[in-house]
Amino acid sequence: METIFNRNKEEHPEPIKAEVQGQLPTWLQGVLLRNGPGMHTIGDTKYNHWFDGLALLHSFTFKNGEVYYRSKYLRSDTYNCNIEANRIVVSEFGTMAYPDPCKNIFAKAFSYLSHTIPEFTDNCLINIMKTGDDYYATSETNFIRKIDPQTLETLDKVDYSKYVAVNLATSHPHYDSAGNILNMGTSIVDKGRTKYVLFKIPSSVPEKEKKKSCFKHLEVVCSIPSRSLLQPSYYHSFGITENYIVFIEQPFKLDIVKLATAYIRGVNWASCLSFHKEDKTWFHFVDRKTKKEVSTKFYTDALVLYHHINAYEEDGHVVFDIVAYRDNSLYDMFYLKKLDKDFEVNNKLTSIPTCKRFVVPLQYDKDAEVGSNLVKLPTSATAVKEKDGSIYCQPEILCEGIELPRVNYDYNGKKYKYVYATEVQWSPVPTKIAKLNVQTKEVLHWGEDHCWPSEPIFVPSPDAREEDEGVVLTCVVVSEPNKAPFLLILDAKTFKELGRATVNVEMHLDLHGMFIPQNDLGAETE
């Protein structure tokens, strides 16, 4: 356990040929590119939290039935400063560093609240984002790092705040049919307001401006005022349908005064997050055409969520599925001091992740009686009209114990059937992966003893006619000593194993990633 979470992982920048068992589809050509923390000790200093570790990119390249593995640390400014100093000198969300000789690169850790908040790290360890023909490693700060998806080399650094007034941004953007990116970020006390900003990054630029970055053409779609000036909601993702943006303002809040003074108080930024269980969770819907928010107030009970699954419209309703918790215990479980050999026995979630479906009637009879359920679809989810005109929503439970959900992205924002996810139950350690049919609630599983699979990624087969026609890819770390990790390839329809590619390296647990088809990569490589 300590080996998997705490020990620094060696990078393998040159391709290593994997041992392939089984039969891989001939059409599966391209790169599975993933991101996650790989280094938690630098010199004599250690990070406090697993999510603080230095970003380690790794990839599996599929080429004519063969599979090649490589990994490389993201050469961020954070990485370079820390390695040069041989200690942690740049603060992360769960680890405050003192003193910081990189002040010429990173803004002061505190300043007058009306002018700025701490500038964060560029240790982009959470996900991968595609912008036009380029790929970026991302986290939840205002920095992203361009990377080469084939060699894993680190390239340009991009600061969102140069193009849009945000201090934080999600690592789960959405892509429209033209390849444009839609993302959200939080603007903290900008001109006396704290707001959630929805912005669009075009997939291409006009021919006469080819030398300019797509980010120079970034467009603010709209903004949603925070219900609290100094305590905005934390959010990890958001939803999208054909006509609406779905944003959930949850009572898991970031205290800006505490954030601005964390350095001088000797505490980490994570301590500035708190769950307000007595508060409501508010649902916001923004019309993508008019860029205006729906005026009706929709809410539910207090919850914490990280991942939206999918959303769609049906007969005047917006239906959205999320993985939700009753509290914020998940983050606290990943402090490294808790990840010892007895972790699985002693470190339990106090709230199991639950797949919830909310059904929100955007079109309803305004003369409906107070107390009546406005939902007209066949579901146990309800939306009850209150005296003040607001609508109180209760979900349908689709299943319990799943996280890191993915769908066939061709069905993103549309009515769909299938979710692919890890199974976590009362511990955040994934022991299986699952395929959930959200219409029948039937679940298929894959699992083996001592195996910890990563977020499963669906790859559609060419000319697929059905939603689950393709394969599911997951990186599997083995907790049993002397057993090598592997990439698992499942038939998405049957959830049966097609093959696996085993690599004799110490692979790290990762977070998120994407599959890049060969046609999107340009020149072939291993």
From Swiss-Prot:
Chief subcellular location: cytoplasm
Keywords: Cytoplasm, Dioxygenase, Iron, Lipid metabolism, Metal-binding, Oxidoreductase
Listed cofactors: Fe(2+)
GO molecular function terms listed in the Swiss-Prot or TrEMBL record: beta-carotene 15,15'-dioxygenase activity; carotenoid dioxygenase activity; metal ion binding; monooxygenase activity
Documented EC number(s): 1.13.11.63
InterPro entries: Carotenoid_Oase
Sites where the protein binds Fe cation: H172, H236, H307, H512
UniProt pathway annotation: Cofactor metabolism; retinol metabolism
Entry function: Symmetrically cleaves beta-carotene into two molecules of retinal using a dioxygenase mechanism.
Family from the record: Belongs to the carotenoid oxygenase family.
Protein name: Beta,beta-carotene 15,15'-dioxygenase
Organism name: Gallus gallus (Chicken)
Organism lineage string: Eukaryota, Metazoa, Chordata, Craniata, Vertebrata
